[in-house]
Amino acid sequence: MKKQSSLRGRVTVFLPLFFALVLILPGLENGSYARWMLALSFPCVLLLLLLLPSRLFFLDRPSFSAVAVLCGFGMMAGVYLSEDAALSLALSYALLLLFLFAGAVSARSFRASPFSAVFPAALGLFLLSGPFWTGVSFSLAEGGIALLLFSVSAFLSRRNYVPALGVTLAGLLLLLLGKDIPSALLWGIAAVLLFWAGSGSGLWSLLSLVTVCALFAGAMLLFPSSEPSPSVPSLPSPASMPLLAPEVPQSSPSSGSDPLWLLLGRQYGSVFLLLSLLLMLVLLIRGASLALNARSAFHGILGLGVVLFFGGRTLLFLLSLSGLLPLASPEPPLILSSLPSLAAHGFLAGLLSGISARNEADLAEDARLSMLAR
């Protein structure tokens, strides 16, 4: 316990100091007071959240630290944006924190019930229908997928396999009709694996696999020449990134059209970018541990769904970056500037914290009942 407390104290001191240095120095070099203040705000907020008791916001320290570091890497790239783009990015990450708290409270408070299954399904399908709305130029697909993960987990834990499969296929159909092939691929694979882990039945696992593959095959036959949705960005070539950090970093601010991961690679090197993505392994391992230790089937399946989402998105990004997957893949998790995507990622990361809090509450209840039995 003493070693764990000492390690927590070192992390609490090291992370804010590290990001204070790497964020404030570029702001001073560019001579921008606004960018300097934005760079200073992130370490201060991070220090405050690390010092507050974790039970206050149901925060899980390991997963929150991994999320905070990945967000910090996004801010490191955001320092080189224009002032307006940097301000927009800072507000997006602030909104991510709010959705992270919302996800933690949701996973801590909700159990598998008809409400926790039907309401997220309806709202998620509504968000996935965004490409059919008039005047909407951004994608809400990841927010819809996050809600469908919540809904399908509730259905599977209640052994309502038919509604779970119906919600899965409805979401997949909307993604395919919206021509968001990478998101459809991510959701299809995650849903099939959830059925395999949550149903405990080979028949339902096989049925989900067959129906998902049939939908993909039907979409390819009906839309053989369709292009991905304009809301899904194509990946720039990694050839513009140096292997290591350049001796003279670029000081001119970007207009904001380049993705954050590309700016991060240009300023600090592709090796640093790949090492930063390795931090996603910490989040995935912690999420898998929380899912395996969950006392309820709902929280176990939900934790597995979050791990599949973040792991699948990272894998799609790496495959597309290396040219092995001929698709316009999404950007890596948390290191991006899209406000709807950051909100969805914050909500999903918060679910892991809520599952951790739920596990601790269940263990405390078991200990109390054990004491009463004596």
Language-model features: where?
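Interfacial loop-to-transmembrane-helix boundary motif in multi-pass membrane proteins
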Residues: 59-67, 84-92, 102-126, 161-166, ...
